[in-house]
């Protein structure tokens, strides 16, 4: 499947659920305690990270989405730390403070990248607290595209059916990361994302792929879900919908250090992608890739857009050089910019590649780190050059160009001028051969407006494709 990242900055998401603070105490272990057969950890690092539903919100914000976060907190120092933690990263908190309950905290002690123990500080919230939180959240539905219900069974989401129905009636998609053995609580949700253990807790042991699909479709019908995405660890993900064939997406994780927060990453990437306009299969592929990134990190973590671009390029074959599509080239350029590389771009028909072309392209490449050559397709060459042209089809012209040491990427375009593709890619330097005036070069104004440069290079005298063709015809 070809995967393209949508414009995450357009996504407007509300996350409602169990917020918590993930606290990490880290240090070396050098001896066993004389008091009990346990290691002694000398703490030299303390770190607080927003967890649970707050980690979902942070993932959305890190991808570039606009996100509000509704949850239950206590009136304590932990709530203050959690508030600062989410606000610093661009999340807008919408807390309901409960005086007699602590803000949920999970303390993990780590040494040598291994978790030794986890200590939980929490008390279950009352049902009335959940009712108030969901009622408070209803007022936010008119300004968002997607709701995420992040349920950790701590009491923030008790009976959300009415809230789900109201959101759906307003055209808002509702995604649920479920908990417990009763998925009926989420009746009418757009999508639920159980892991395999959560899925089997509801439907019983899954004995085969066919059994999984049958049981998933049974849940769709029973609870009026639009889709179920079952996350399956090393087996990847399986998407089941009512009106389309199932979709199996293999895992892309290379190394697994810590699965903490992987489910949060999946639903946050789904929500951000869908809110930004991606279709469901695309959103699932993006979420699967994001999960593969985050499990390679230690502790509760987020995934950035740049990390997603790099991972998608690696796993979907879109990071290479040579002949590429526009979308593939857009991915590659984001990586090049991340590496601080200067990108040069030129264009032409290059119908019969000759020594003048080779010299010109070497000059162009010398002006930067990477060179893009945009090539007119066959129809546009015919319109520009007339009958009998091109001599070589576009795939052959691009293959020859891609074989030159000076050329990094070759991309086709179908218009008579490259203005549109140049305006999309916006190289650091646009070059053109001949006696053009800079103001007359297609795409030049867009490059300059974006902070780039435009330069005219000379061709070698006496060498041209037209002259070569005429010489061939004269000698026949």
Swiss-Prot record:
GO cellular component, one term: cytosol
Keywords: ATP-binding, Carbohydrate metabolism, Kinase, Multifunctional enzyme, Nucleotide-binding, Nucleotidyltransferase, Transferase
Region of interest (Cytidylyltransferase), ranges: 345-476
Associated pathway: Nucleotide-sugar biosynthesis; ADP-L-glycero-beta-D-manno-heptose biosynthesis; ADP-L-glycero-beta-D-manno-heptose from D-glycero-beta-D-manno-heptose 7-phosphate: step 1/4; Nucleotide-sugar biosynthesis; ADP-L-glycero-beta-D-manno-heptose biosynthesis; ADP-L-glycero-beta-D-manno-heptose from D-glycero-beta-D-manno-heptose 7-phosphate: step 3/4
Residues binding ATP: 195-198
Active site: 264
InterPro entries registered for this protein in UniProt: Bifunc_HldE, Carboh/pur_kinase_PfkB_CS, Cyt_trans-like, PfkB_dom, RfaE_dom_I, RfaE_dom_II, Ribokinase-like, Rossmann-like_a/b/a_fold
EC number: 2.7.1.167, 2.7.7.70
Gene Ontology terms, MF aspect: ATP binding; heptose 7-phosphate kinase activity; heptose-1-phosphate adenylyltransferase activity; phosphotransferase activity, alcohol group as acceptor
Domain of life: Bacteria
Pfam families attached to this UniProt entry: CTP_transf_like (PF01467), PfkB (PF00294)
Region (Ribokinase): 1-319
SUPFAM superfamilies, per database record: Nucleotidylyl transferase (SSF52374), Ribokinase-like (SSF53613)
A Gene Ontology BP annotation from the UniProt entry: ADP-L-glycero-beta-D-manno-heptose biosynthetic process
Catalytic activity: D-glycero-beta-D-manno-heptose 7-phosphate + ATP = D-glycero-beta-D-manno-heptose 1,7-bisphosphate + ADP + H(+); D-glycero-beta-D-manno-heptose 1-phosphate + ATP + H(+) = ADP-D-glycero-beta-D-manno-heptose + diphosphate
Assembly behavior: Homodimer.
Role: Catalyzes the ADP transfer from ATP to D-glycero-beta-D-manno-heptose 1-phosphate, yielding ADP-D-glycero-beta-D-manno-heptose.
Protein family per UniProt: In the N-terminal section; belongs to the carbohydrate kinase PfkB family. In the C-terminal section; belongs to the cytidylyltransferase family.
The name this protein goes by in its record: Bifunctional protein HldE
Species this chain originates from: Shewanella sp. (strain W3-18-1)
Classification lineage: Bacteria, Pseudomonadati, Pseudomonadota, Gammaproteobacteria, Alteromonadales
């Amino acid at each position: 499947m070809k995967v393209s990242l949508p414009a995450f900055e357009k996504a407007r998401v509300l996350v409602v659920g169990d917020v918590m603070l993930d606290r990490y105490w880290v240090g070396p272990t050098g001896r066993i305690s004389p008091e009990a057969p346990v290691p002694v950890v000398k703490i030299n690092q303390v770190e607080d990270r927003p967890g649970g539903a707050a980690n979902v919100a942070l993932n959305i914000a890190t991808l570039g989405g606009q996100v509000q976060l509704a949850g239950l907190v206590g009136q304590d120092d932990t709530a203050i730390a959690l508030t600062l933690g989410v606000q610093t990263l661009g999340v807008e908190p919408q807390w309901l403070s409960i005086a007699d309950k602590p803000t949920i905290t999970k303390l993990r002690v780590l040494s040598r990248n291994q978790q030794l123990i986890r200590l939980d500080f929490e008390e279950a919230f009352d049902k009335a607290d959940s009712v108030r939180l969901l009622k408070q959240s209803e007022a936010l539905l008119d300004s968002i595209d997607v709701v995420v219900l992040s349920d950790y069974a701590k009491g923030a989401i008790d009976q959300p059916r009415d809230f789900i129905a109201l959101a759906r009636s307003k055209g808002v998609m509702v995604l649920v990361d479920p908990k417990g053995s009763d998925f009926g609580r989420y009746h009418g949700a757009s999508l639920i994302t159980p892991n395999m253990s959560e899925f089997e807790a509801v439907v019983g042991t899954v004995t085969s792929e066919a059994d999984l699909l049958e049981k998933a479709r049974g849940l769709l019908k029973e609870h009026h879900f639009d889709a179920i995405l079952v996350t399956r660890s090393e087996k990847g993900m399986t998407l089941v919908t009512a009106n389309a064939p199932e979709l199996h997406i293999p895992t892309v994780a290379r190394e697994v250090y810590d699965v903490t927060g992987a489910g949060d990453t999946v639903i946050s990437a789904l929500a951000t992608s869908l809110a930004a306009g991606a279709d469901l299969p695309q959103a699932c592929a993006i979420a699967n890739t994001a999960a593969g990134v985050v499990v390679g990190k230690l502790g509760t973590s987020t995934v950035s857009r740049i990390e997603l671009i790099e991972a998608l390029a690696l796993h979907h074959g879109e990071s290479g050089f040579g002949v590429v599509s526009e979308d593939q080239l857009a991915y590659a350029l984001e990586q090049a910019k991340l590496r601080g590389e200067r990108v040069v771009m030129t264009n032409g028909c290059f119908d019969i590649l000759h020594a003048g072309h080779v010299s010109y392209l070497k000059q162009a490449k010398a002006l930067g780190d990477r060179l893009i050559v945009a090539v007119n397709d066959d129809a546009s060459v015919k319109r520009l050059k007339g009958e009998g042209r091109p001599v070589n089809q576009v795939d052959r012209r691009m293959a020859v160009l891609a074989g030159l040491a000076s050329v990094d990427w070759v991309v086709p375009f179908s218009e008579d001028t490259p203005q549109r593709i140049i305006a999309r890619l916006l190289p650091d330097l646009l070059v053109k051969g001949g006696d053009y005036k800079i103001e007359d070069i297609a795409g030049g104004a867009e490059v300059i407006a974006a902070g780039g440069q435009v330069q005219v290079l000379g061709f070698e005298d006496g060498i041209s494709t037209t002259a070569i063709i005429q010489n061939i015809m004269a000698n026949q």
